[in-house]
Curated annotation (Swiss-Prot):
This is 3-isopropylmalate dehydratase large subunit. It comes from Bacillus cereus (strain ATCC 14579 / DSM 31 / CCUG 7414 / JCM 2152 / NBRC 15305 / NCIMB 9373 / NCTC 2599 / NRRL B-3711). One of its GO terms (molecular function) is metal ion binding. Keywords: 4Fe-4S, Amino-acid biosynthesis, Branched-chain amino acid biosynthesis, Iron, Iron-sulfur, Leucine biosynthesis, Lyase, Metal-binding. It is an enzyme of class 4 (lyase). The lineage of its organism: Bacteria, Bacillati, Bacillota, Bacilli, Bacillales. It catalyses: (2R,3S)-3-isopropylmalate = (2S)-2-isopropylmalate.
Length: 464
């Protein structure tokens, strides 16, 4: 019987197996940020250990930093975490993309764009959405702080091998429907626990048609379905994306041959298989307090089925049977490790070009990295957004989470391109609706959700 992509990735990295069936995996890349690393570095210090492979470790500032005045950090804990990361990286000789550095940005944006993320690698980070890197045919997953310390000290991690789930995406996406809508559809249909104990492998016609940035969006939210990771077999698009980037392999052609072996064999069998025809998908909007509480834009909000629905409706200030078009939007956030890359900003700009943000709506665009920001400005996207009434910010996690100055006031609704809509995720009492960049941009213009398939906007942008 053939092997799944998961099998090939796993077997290449097993160092040892213990009596409990756990495998010791070698870790090829360890990404670090300011929030989950301080205790891990302190653990090394207390035990007089060093970082085993600083050359396979890379740190950045992202979660806590302000995106308006990046040097004016007024929160005491945030400042302490940022200062501590600087000190730790200096002491342990770990490369750091600090505030103002041209390589700085959200950890799951800079990894791929710098060429750190590569097919065949095992990648870990003290962050839930490390699965993003699986879009390159890497086995990437989030870890806790004690595991961060273990990887820093040993460059290995004890893990139990997950099962393999194959998610086949058949057909061609309609105009106005994106990778974000696919994952929100999957979550709304199968729930937030469908992937528990699995690694999700996405494949099929729709995957082949996607660019790398859409694939990253898809894998980014595999964790929201309970999966250990999301992966996609690398192809020519993957290889072309990695080629020539700063940290890409110098012996690219020989490495590429090894990358080409990373696919699921035709006679391999998944532990669970899901087939989705994307041909008739619509834009999605979440209405509740987890990512599975979502509906098509042309559907009414569902009836209450249990206490969780009751609580979600109450928290969100919405009602069963309500039209999605009637959901008010006071804030719009285009950013996060899910949707802050150049193509995301291009799509959003194509929606708002020549138009104005609705009076009373606060709209932010937060590029995922300094390089994304510079590329967008080179194309004139910042002018399109600013002329429409958006705020153009510096890179960071921003309004994805209530951990920095960018927050949604209590009781107000935000159309967000991020990945989580939990209670208080964007600030105390904030009401978060997860959508694609196009849907978020359109909501900024109208002050409520609209069906972008029925709205007139440019499919391509003129940068003159």
């Amino acid at each position: 019987m053939g092997k799944r992509l998961l099998d090939k990735l796993w077997e290449r990295h097993v160092v040892a197996t213990n009596e409990n069936g756990l495998d010791l995996l070698y870790i090829d890349l360890h990404l670090v940020h300011e929030v989950t690393s301080p205790q891990a570095f302190e653990g090394l210090r207390l035990t007089n250990r060093t970082v085993r492979r600083p050359d396979l470790t890379f740190a950045t500032m992202d979660h806590n930093i302000p995106t308006k005045d990046v040097w004016n950090i007024t929160d005491r804990i945030a400042k302490q975490q940022l200062d501590t990361l600087r000190q730790n990286c200096k002491q342990f000789q770990v490369p750091l993309a600090d505030i103002g550095d041209e390589e700085q940005g959200i950890v799951h944006v800079i990894g791929p764009e710098l060429g750190l993320t590569q097919p065949g690698k095992t990648i870990v980070c003290g962050d839930s959405h490390t699965a993003t890197h699986g879009a390159f045919g890497a086995l990437a997953f989030g870890i806790g702080t004690s595991e961060v310390e273990h990887v820093l000290a040993t460059q290995t991690l004890w893990q139990r091998k997950p099962k393999a789930m194959g998610i086949e995406l058949k057909g061609k996406l309609p105009q106005g429907v994106y990778a974000k809508d696919i994952i929100l559809h999957l979550l709304s249909k199968y729930g937030v626990a469908v992937g528990t104990g699995y690694v999700m492998e996405f494949y099929g016609e729709a995957i082949h048609a996607m660019d790398m940035e859409e694939r990253m969006t898809l894998c980014n939210m595999a964790i929201e379905g309970g999966a250990k990771a999301g992966i996609i077999a690398p192809d020519e698009k993957t290889f072309a994306y990695v080629k020539g980037r700063k940290y890409a392999p110098k012996d690219y052609e020989s490495i590429k041959k090894k990358w080409s072996e990373l696919y699921t064999d035709l006679d391999a069998v998944y532990d669970l298989h899901i087939l989705v025809d994307v041909t008739d998908l619509a834009p999605y909007v979440t209405w509740g307090t987890n990512p599975s509480m979502g509906v098509r834009i042309d559907e009414k909000l569902p009836e209450k089925h249990d206490a969780n629905d009751e609580r979600a409706f109450s928290y969100m200030g919405l009602s069963p049977g309500q039209s999605t078009y009637d959901i008010p939007v006071q804030h719009v956030f285009i950013g996060s490790c899910t949707n802050s890359r150049l193509s995301d900003l291009e799509i959003a700009a194509s929606v708002v070009k020549g138009k104005k943000v609705k009076e009373g709506v606060r709209a932010l665009v937060v590029p995922g990295s300094q390089r994304v920001r510079e590329a967008a400005m080179h194309k004139g996207l910042h002018r399109i957004f600013e002329e429409a009434g958006f705020e153009w910010r510096e890179p960071g996690c921003s309004m994805c989470l209530g951990m920095n100055p960018d927050q949604v006031p209590e009781g107000e609704h935000c159309a967000s391109t991020s990945n989580r809509n939990f209670e208080g995720r964007q600030g105390k009492g904030a009401r978060t609706h997860l959508v694609s960049p196009a849907m978020a941009a359109a909501a900024a213009l109208y002050g409520h959700f609209v069906d972008i398939r029925k709205e007139s906007y440019d499919g391509a942008i003129s940068y003159s």
